[in-house]
């Protein structure tokens, strides 16, 4: 891959990761701050590029995780093993407790956001569009091979991004200190 394609991949990995951390996690899920329309759109595009479900679903699972951490209601319960917490939870049906407790979480704040309503409605279309964008930029601007642009700019970037995110679910809960309070969402 052209060095610019590698730089592009790193920048887009950082962008998607920041959108998950500062957007989906801090702003939307935990309501740590408010943002104007255009910053919300910017984060919505980045979270779509991260391919970790739409923000409403991501936030519901995360709120459930915080409320019932390391229990059967936790979507990525570390007590079910390191692999399960890392990525295995995505390969099996959700534990009945996850579904039961997920229904108890109030998501009306996020469901009222028109940016998130748009993302949820068109998510299945928006994800491939982000992959086209990630491939198009290297091909158009520095004449990268289409296959290389796709595999480095879209696929490798996604694999790195997902494993960085999943490491929080697995490594942080397996080896980290557990100061969380289940009364806080």
Which role does the model predict for each range below?
Residues 107-114, 175-185:
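Active-site-proximal inter-transmembrane loops
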């Amino acid at each position: 891959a052209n060095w610019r394609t590698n730089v592009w991949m790193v920048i887009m990995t950082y962008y998607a990761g920041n959108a998950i951390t500062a957007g989906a996690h801090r702003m939307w899920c935990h309501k740590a701050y408010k943002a104007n329309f255009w910053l919300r759109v910017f984060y919505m595009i980045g979270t779509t590029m991260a391919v970790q479900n739409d923000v409403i679903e991501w936030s519901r699972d995360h709120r459930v995780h915080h409320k019932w951490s390391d229990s059967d209601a936790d979507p990525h319960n570390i007590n079910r093993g390191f692999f399960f917490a890392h990525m295995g939870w995505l390969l099996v049906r959700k534990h009945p407790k996850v579904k039961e407790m997920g229904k108890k979480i109030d998501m009306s704040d996020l469901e009222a956001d028109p940016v998130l309503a748009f993302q949820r409605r068109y998510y299945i279309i928006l994800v491939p569009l982000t992959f086209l964008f990630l491939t198009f930029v290297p091909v158009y601007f520095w004449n990268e091979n289409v296959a290389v642009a796709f595999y480095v700019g879209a696929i490798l970037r996604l694999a790195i991004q997902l494993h960085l995110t999943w490491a929080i679910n697995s490594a942080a809960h397996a080896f980290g200190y557990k100061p969380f309070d289940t009364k806080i969402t």
